[in-house]
Design a protein with these regions (language model features):
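Hydrophobic, membrane-inserted alpha-helices
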Residues: 183-185
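Membrane-interface helix-loop-helix modules in multi-pass inner-membrane proteins
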Residues: 70-180
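N-terminal signal-anchor module of multipass membrane proteins
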Residues: 1-102
């Protein structure tokens, strides 16, 4: 089967799902009808919020053949594609764990929660930003230094983290990004 063209149905489902993801992620900030939220553990129904992530996973699954064919058309080998998948998986899992822990940092660390979260997010951008390709050696060196600064910052943020009970960073819940990372495999 040829997967070279855009599939409008997948694009439409992706757009609707992304819109719903933004919407349901902000529901907690307002009063809303019960059916828009998540069903409770012992409730027998699905709220709108309960179907958004499965829809996202469906769209991801439907897009995989297109992404693989596109990668191979660009001349990537199977090893390069597998390496890309593993790297992205690790990145999403690390992001998920870090973001889940940022809201529970102990005051003794000496960094306010919002500042800690901003520094963690800055490290993500420095590490996983797709820097432009260039022939300029100084520019390439700058991009490499920025990535190393991001890695050092992320390691520092992991090392200094302590929650109010004295626990170090841990994966109590992977967070939505971590879950996406695991399903990416």
């Amino acid at each position: 089967m040829d997967f070279t063209g855009r599939n409008k149905a997948i694009d439409i489902i992706r757009a609707l799902t992304m819109t719903l993801m933004i919407f349901v992620n902000d529901l907690w900030t307002i009063e809303y009808p019960k059916w828009l939220g998540h069903a409770g553990m012992n409730e027998d129904y699905l709220g709108l919020s309960d179907i958004v992530f499965p829809c996202f996973l469906f769209v991801v699954g439907m897009s995989i053949p297109y992404a693989l064919e596109n990668a191979f058309k660009k001349g990537r080998t199977g090893v390069q594609v597998a390496s890309h998948i593993l790297t992205r998986t690790l990145a999403l899992i690390v992001m998920g764990i870090m973001l889940q822990n940022t809201g529970n940092i102990a005051p003794e660390v000496g960094i306010a929660k919002p500042v800690y979260k901003l520094l963690v997010l800055a490290s993500f951008f420095l590490i996983w930003n797709i820097y432009p390709r260039t022939e300029n050696k100084n520019r390439r060196l700058l991009y490499k230094v920025l990535k190393y600064v991001g890695v050092a910052l992320l390691i520092f943020m992991i090392v200094i983290y302590v929650d109010p009970k004295g626990n170090l960073i841990r994966a109590g819940w992977w967070g939505i990004l971590g879950l996406i990372g695991w399903t990416y495999l």
